[in-house]
Amino acid sequence: MFCIQCEQTIRTPAGNGCSYAQGMCGKLAATSDLQDLLIYMLQGVSVYAVKARELGVVDTEVDTFVPKAFFSTLTNVNFDDERIIAYAKQAAQYRESLKNAYEATCEQSGKTAEQMPPVAQLVLGTSKLEMLSQAPISLLNKDKNNIHEDILGLRLLCLYGLKGAAAYMEHARVLGKTDVDIAADFHRIMAFLGEPSVDADKLFSTAMEIGQLNYRIMALLDAGETEAFGHPEPTVVNTKPVKGKAILVSGHDMKDLELILEQTAGKGINVYTHGEMLPALAYPAFKKYPHLVGNYGSAWQNQQKEFANFPGAVVMTSNCIIDPNVGQYSDRIFTRSIVGWPGVVHVTGDDFSVVIEKALSNDGFHYDEIPHNITIGFARNALMAAAPTVVENVKNGSIKHFFLVGGCDGDKSERSYFTDLAKSAPKDSIILTLGCGKYKFNKLEFGDINGIPRLLDIGQCNDAYSAIQLAIALSQIFECDINELPLNLVLSWFEQKAIVVLLTLLSLGVKNIRTGPTPPAFLTANLAKILEDKFGLRNTTTVEADLKTMLNVA
């Protein structure tokens, strides 16, 4: 086992990364090894997808399968060995199908089929034991003793960034949005990573390519969400329980939320969003469901307590899931799509009857708690509509600064930095937030500036796209470079989606971003210095010191 993809990975003077019997996330060594093997198989599929495409052979099933299966290897997504094995076997079948199509097309056109790299030739074991015996070939740091540590760090930056992009591709696909050019570029990069490079410049340029690719994917996902559910609008949301039977929907998949709402209508069940599903409450399509009563709980890391106290059924539509046995609710939590936990019921298809039955058999909430409201829904359209008013307030001096404070949440005590930063931001500043990092301060009262709320919740982590559109619009209005705006980005990171959002921002030329609370363990000190020199990327320090720098206070 070697896994170093998330913030909570082991860090010691002897080296970084989880490499023992179990990772800090709870992932067992065998699961980690199987995931690495799955990635290796998927890279082999992409090798053939690239070669087949060169001859005009495109398999759209492969184009959707590879990102989806890759998504299952993100932090806190799938801990079920049998599901990972099934993905690996399916990958082997797709690779063989593409291989046959490629070779047949070569023969028909009189071309000689190319010799493929080892990553496209592995004969997958037939049993779990055989697959685990093959794991060393796919270990991410297998050649660490023969390469510079910066090379390994760059490879991992690319791999983890592409994982995040794959997740957003799958989110878009669920909403019916795919793109053949995006798929082609994804396969090309996936295949490149399958043949470990030692070219630092090529790896760095690939990281920027991944950022650019993800920008296109986020635009695709934005279109999918707004076409399906309308444009989010400022919405007041209750964050306290309401009397009645209950279902909690977590993750990012709003299509699943829609299905659950349709199937629970008239059944006396209240539906709540959780974590990254909170922004769904701002979409017009969901406002026709009176039994979508609000948001329950906070970010992913608190779920073992919050789900244990939730008297109903819980559905995990995507990341993040952690051990449900701790809070003894494994019998009433359900997984969907790429999510998996051993022993937890996995819902396939679009029938949520088993979830509904579980909700009805539980007590539900016995009384209404006193409401606590927050306001959400300041995504792209709402921000653009408010832009003229914002510009006027900037010009008259009422608004002097903007902060984007968001990203992933986590349980490290150092993350109080983000709460303190939001609370310490000057009263003449606007705070934009997104992702589950918002839960560090989204229930606090920040007031307004001439009717403009000082806290603007943009949405899910992928809604960084909305923030980028606002920044571009403001830079055009003020006729300045995006980096000359009175705007500072402070991003909390935990896993691979945050990595690819960061790569997206860097690839667009956004500079002087702060990330925290700790830098990715796979980035060497030298790589961190290069990123600082090139982009002004730096780690958070203290709120007082960072604010002085961001506000240019002497």
Swiss-Prot record:
List of residues binding [2Fe-2S] cluster: C3, C6, C18, C25
Q: Where mainly found? A: cytoplasm
Q: What positions are modified (Cysteine persulfide)?
A: C408
The molecular function terms in GO held by this entry are: 2 iron, 2 sulfur cluster binding; hydroxylamine reductase activity; metal ion binding; peroxidase activity
Please list the GO biological process terms of this entry: nitric oxide catabolic process; response to hydrogen peroxide
Cofactor(s) this protein requires: [2Fe-2S] cluster; hybrid [4Fe-2O-2S] cluster
Residues that, per the record, bind hybrid [4Fe-2O-2S] cluster: H252, E276, C320, C408, C436, C461, E495, K497
> How is this protein annotated for GO cellular component?
cytoplasm
Any idea of its EC number? 1.7.99.1
Q: How is the cofactor bound?
A: Binds 1 [2Fe-2S] cluster.
What does the record give as the reaction this protein catalyses?
A: A + NH4(+) + H2O = hydroxylamine + AH2 + H(+)
Entry function: Catalyzes the reduction of hydroxylamine to form NH(3) and H(2)O.
Q: Which NCBIfam families match?
A: hybrid_clust, PRK05290.1
Family per similarity comment: Belongs to the HCP family.
This one is known as Hydroxylamine reductase
- Organism taxonomic ancestry: Bacteria, Pseudomonadati, Pseudomonadota, Gammaproteobacteria, Alteromonadales
Give the encoding gene's name.
hcp
